[in-house]
A protein has these predicted regions:
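Ankyrin repeat boundary/linker residues
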Residues: 53, 86, 121-122
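Ankyrin repeat domain, specifically the short helix-to-loop turn at the C-terminus of the second helix
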Residues: 40-48, 73-81, 108-116
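Positively charged n-region of N-terminal signal peptides that target proteins for export
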Residues: 1-4
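C-terminal motif of bacterial Sec signal peptides marking the signal peptidase cleavage site
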Residues: 15-16
């Protein structure tokens, strides 16, 4: 009986301490659609906050392009790099200011956290 109790307790502890599985939607797809709950699930499951898609976009690139400030704040709080460059050297800030003139709140947020454009990074060497 004592062995069964210890085994049960150990199983409960192991299950309770494991990471939850990521959702059935990619972190990039969740970012496109503003699905903050799926993003949170990905991060809790250990998905890389700076995971790149086929063209080198991170989730932060996606939300900067789509105007998802709340998700941008979450990703930055979880350690997302604000200066990761994708294809053509584009950073999340490039996407917030060049292609979407109404993304000033996200551009300001990125700047507050050290965000730079690809051209600024290139000039720094």
């Amino acid at each position: 009986m004592k062995h069964l109790l210890l085994t049960t307790i150990a199983a409960v502890v192991l299950v309770g301490c494991s990471k939850p599985p990521p959702p059935n939607i990619s972190i990039h797809h969740a970012a496109v659609h503003g699905n903050i709950e799926a993003i949170k699930q990905h991060l809790a499951a250990g998905t890389d906050v700076d995971a790149k898609d086929a063209i080198g976009w991170t989730p932060l690139h996606v939300v900067a392009d789509n105007g998802r400030k709340e998700i941008a704040e979450l990703l930055i709080a979880k350690g997302a790099s604000v200066n990761t460059q994708a294809a053509l050297g584009l950073t999340p800030l490039d996407l917030a200011i060049r292609f979407r003139s109404n993304r000033t709140e996200i551009a300001d947020l990125l700047r507050e956290h050290g965000g730079k454009t690809g051209e600024e990074l290139k000039a720094e060497g």
